Amino acid sequence: MSETATWQPSASVPNLLKRAAIMTEIRRFFADRGVLEVETPCMSQATVTDIHLFPFETRFVGPGHSQGMNLYLMTSPEYHMKRLLAAGCGPVFQLCRSFRNEEMGRYHNPEFTMLEWYRPHYDMYRLMNEVDDLLQQVLDCQPAESLSYQQAFQRHLEIDPLSADKTQLREAAAKLDVSNIADTEEDRDTLLQLLFTVGVEPHIGKEKPTFIYHFPASQASLAQISTEDHRVAERFEVYYKGIELANGFHELTDAREQQQRFEQDNRKRAARGLPQQPIDNHLLDALKAGMPDCSGVALGVDRLVMLALGAERLADVIAFTVDRA
């Protein structure tokens, strides 16, 4: 394909046909298990507060809103899907577009396809097993292995991420030759993420998918804190062949705790000179009304298809990446 023929799709037609077959297979997987497919908005009046996520923003100027209404493209359908759970929809899944105003590259595109699903009355481990089932079916891979976040750091970096102070984390960073980044970073979780990315990720999920679970409580996001060890959150991620595929939680259902986390995120954003984001009060109201105890997971479909097809980059499995959009 000519480099100058930018009207043409990024992916080949055979790859797009294979992608369509995988989408059908995913829907069949959930239909066979009685999980309802839902559709939720791509835009919202509120957005994520996470300091590491950057949403696209637009304005609605239609009738009744001549002064304009700020809207955000969804980085994930999570908040709307949790409102459906609180309304009594039962187990739900969604295949949808998500948007993040971040990087573009081998594994990233600002517009991407997300598979997200929620299972009432599932704990984190039961959902991990279901994710493993889906990966084996779509990728024809071996059953996954599991490591706690603590075990992964101890195995590959010989450091305990739950007890190490920032000086010890910087010493570990020096051994990985990333002191130029670590020495000026004051946020402990950012240091941990740096070490995980550089020192752990390259060593896991090579032959089979690998689940990393029980992230530090400070990285709980929307997950519950473990009742067995308050230092960790009921959160997991799964990696395969150098790619992060999914991020899952035993979901937080306490509205007050969730609001406190949103507010803490905004304080961190302010400290970093980032804009504070509007908190989703609809989600908080849904939690107050009573969302069932559940676990949920978000999985990057484009990355899944890339692995299934043995492709080298997302552009090989997306019809039009942002540079051709």
Swiss-Prot record:
It comes from the Bacteria. PROSITE patterns: AA_TRNA_LIGASE_II. Keywords: ATP-binding, Ligase, Nucleotide-binding. Substrate binds at residues 76-78, 118, 251. The keyword ATP-binding applies. InterPro entries: Aa-tRNA-synt_II, aa-tRNA-synth_II, aa-tRNA-synth_II/BPL/LPL, EpmA, Lys-tRNA-synth_II_C. GO terms for biological process: lysyl-tRNA aminoacylation. ATP binds at residues 100-102, 109, 244-245, 300. One of its GO terms (molecular function) is tRNA binding. Homodimer. Belongs to the class-II aminoacyl-tRNA synthetase family. EpmA subfamily. This is Elongation factor P--(R)-beta-lysine ligase.
